[in-house]
Structures are given as C-alpha cells and as structure tokens.
C-alpha cells in the first residue's frame, strides 16, 4: 500500500522486472481499474514525463531531455500511423529509458514485436482485480472495519473491480455495515461514472449496438448482425475489441462483455429503451437461437419478448428431441406454464409432458398424460394424420418411459417394428444411453437380458436397429459385448471386432453409441490395469466432442474421469471434480445426473464423509426402485454399506 493506493505484489513484481530489464509496461484495462493512480504510485521516485493522448498539444516529435520514464495516458486514442512510427522509433532509440502506456484498449499490433521479444509486459484486467486479501488491506488502510462475511459480500458484488471496492469503502464510511442499500448506492455511483466516462463518449451507432447486445451473455458475429440489424457489425466489433477492453473473446468466434459493463448496459437499456424496443431485441435474439436449434435459449428470449405462440410452437418442435439431451428438464418451466387445453390439443406436447413427469418421478402424472394421448388417438379415425402422430408418440413412450422397465420390450419392439414396416407410424429419435457411457445401464437397465443375451442378439437385432434408426448403428454389438463384460467374461475379441465399427457409428450413427463404445473400451482397459490408456480414451473423445459442440456428454465424461482418478489413487483430481463439477444439490434430484450422483458419493466416501455420501444417495432410492435400475441399485447398496 502506497498512500491510499493498493499495489498488488504481482503488479509490483512486473513493474520491477520492466524497470530492470524490459522496455514497456502496458496497462490494458477498462476505466475504473485505477490505471493512472497505480502508475503514478509505481513511478514515484522516477523522473517521469507524463503525456495524455487526448491533449490538444500532444506530440512525440519534440520532447524534453530530462526524463527516464515516458508515461502516455489514454493510449487507445493514438490512431495515426505517423504517431505510431514515431513512437516505435523513440523506443528503439532510447534503450535505457522506460515507457508506460495506459490504455482502455488492447496493445496495438505495432507493439507486438516488443511483446514477442520480451521487452513489453502487459497488465490486463485480471492482474488488477482485487482479491479477498486486497479488499481486507484496502479497507484496513482506510481504517474501516469489515468482517469476513462482509469481505465475501463485497468481493461477490464487485467481482474485485477496484472502483467498485473504492466506492463501497466510501459508502461504508462512518461505520455503516455492508447491506443491500450500500450495494445499490455503489452500483448507482459506478454506473453513473460509466455513463459519463465511457458511454456518452461513444458515437450513437456504437451506443445502439451495445444496448442491442447487452441482454445476451455470449454472442458471435452472426448473432450480433441479426440482433442489431447493423450491416457494419464486423467493423463495430473490431473497433470495440481494439479500442476498449469491455468486449472479450470467449474463443476465436464468440464474445462476451466484461460483467460489470454488461450490468451497466442493462441498466442503461432500462432507462433508454421502450418496452417495445426491448421486446423486439429479444425477439430477434430468439430467432437466432431458434435457427441454431438452441431451443432453451430461444424459449427464454421468446418469453421475454411476450411471443407465447412461438413458445408453444417451439415446445412441440423440441419434443422431437430425446430426453438424453436433457432438454426436458431444461424446459420444464415452459411446459408447466402451458394451459392444459393447449397440451391436450397436441400429441407432441402430451408426449413431452408424459416424459417430463416421468423424469420428475411423477409416474402417476406420466401415466395420466399417456392415457390422454391414447384417448386422443382412439377418438379419431385410423387414417387421420393426427391419430397416426399420436400412435407414433405412444409407441415412442412405450419404449422410452423409464418406469416401464424392459420386461415388455421383447414384445413391444417387434410390434413397433411391424407398425413401422407397414408405415402406420413414424418414430421420433430415441436416447438409448441418456448420455451415459453404457447401453446395459443407459436409458434403461437391460441387466435382465444378460441371461439370454446371445438369443436376444440373434432375434432382436434387426427390429431394434430398424426401430432405433441412427441409434441402432453399432448398438447390438456394443450391448452384447458389455453384457459379457458385466458377467466377467473375456471380451478382448469382441472389443477388437467392435472398434472397426466406430467409423461407421461416427458417419451413420449417434454420439451416444460412440460414447458407449469408448466407455466400454475404457472400462476394459482399466480392468486390465491400463489406467493411462483408459484415461486417454475418454480424454481424447471428450476433446473431440467439446470441439463438435456435443457438450451434453461432458458432465458424465468428467464423472467417469473422476472415477478413474479414484481407481488410480489420485484424490487431488477427484477433489477438483467434486469442488467444481459435482451436482451437490440433494434437495433437487435430476435423474439424468444419476451417474454423477453415484460418483459424488464415491468421492465423499474417499474423503471420509459417510454422512454426506448417504445424503447424496438417499434421493436415488425411489427412482432406482420405481424404474427397475438393478445395476444402479447394486452400486447404491455397496456405497451405502461402505
């Protein structure tokens, strides 16, 4: 702490390194990060020439001689090529002098060479954010007493933003406790500062562009163009990226606003935009998500736009997607908000409600909606397209509903196969794995079939592949291999025969079956003591799935990697998964996460926390019993016994 200025040790270290062996220290952060005050504190005792790029008489051509450090504030305003060339010549001609640049933008390309050679160090926003210790020291320097819980609250609300912390400290002067009124006052002051120091300095097209994008946490160029309707979208994004640090890259194609600035933009939007304007923005965003088949975000935006007709339309379309993708639980609130009369008029919505109730373990409600769908089909002529659709949905539910078990499937699947062959029904897609690394214990528990797996393989393979379509590619061979593995048989030859089918699964099948095949391979490798190979199998698949946007599989892949860590006596990796990715919400059971719940309990047992493990496992018992999940039941009973 220098005076009232907090200098983080990491910042001081980088400054000292530049003074000793570097040339340039570049501050790249939004306003309110204390760049000017911090630079002045660091440069105390150095002969410093201070210039401001927005000064009318700014020039680099004629500089006095008595300086060791040149500081240029508002560096982002240096746009002229002649000035940049002069600056580079000045830096190269003065190897014993140092340069400190304060910018709201990113380092310009003409300074890249200095960065690559290690002569330029950049301080970014994350380098300047306050952490818990910084906040404690900041308040202590102002002789303001704060409790640990208040420090946590200040850090949460300010996200470490220095101006937010400073304003909060001033608002709490005189011994005022940290309370919602203090938070509201601090936000108002910070937002007013943003309005004057940043927002009002932008041209009107930039302001409108920012407000159009503010409601969306993440966007790409295509979405920005569709939402704003501005043909210069690419140029505007490029200008914001180079002249501010308010817009950040998520990856090569996606962007997001710095969180505090986005909160300000939403505040500004409430003030400046009419209700009609805000609804129009959400409607355009919803259309983008709809075209990308991101129905969860589309429904959220259509709800905010007030377009209730589109909500019903999207839910009907969404019912084509299987629950293994998790869409039913994501959209539950939209289904529940529909009038019952509207649901009863749509076979798709009745199917969706039946499955939704089943996933919520409301089996009575699930069967009620199944009955309503059956009544819908029965009261119409057989040739009626609506009746045909209803029969198709009923056949889908007969196979998919978790409470139905597998006992009747030996008769159901051939019957459905005949209906398909006779073109009496068409089936939506299925989920045979529920994004789990297993077929035997995926969407349903097929352990009963293991007793006669060879017979069922011969008799049911053709109808199963026809009924399941893409999900049937590679399914039968993977399922029978997994059945043999679960019975303790050596399946090396079966695995060797299965692996060549992966390319066909990738081309003609589904990622669900590909994950099941890789999951079985990894379990075999683990059983043979090849832990490193098993981990590589899943990590390689995970990286490819993530690159392809198949994010629905990642949570169970991470849980599987955690189990491998436990198997290999790697508690640190298991603890990391537990802290950052475990569900850890026993009061809200999501049966689609059952693999993760069991993994969570394993980690809790490894941590010598049996009570926590029992609390995690307890909600699963009703689901396991109600849906005949024998394999999950064995795992649960073993974990409870431990």
Identify the residue ranges that each predicted region occupies.
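Internal alpha-solenoid helical repeat scaffolds
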Residues: 342-517, 524
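Residue register of alpha-helical TPR repeats
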Residues: 212, 280, 313, 348, ...
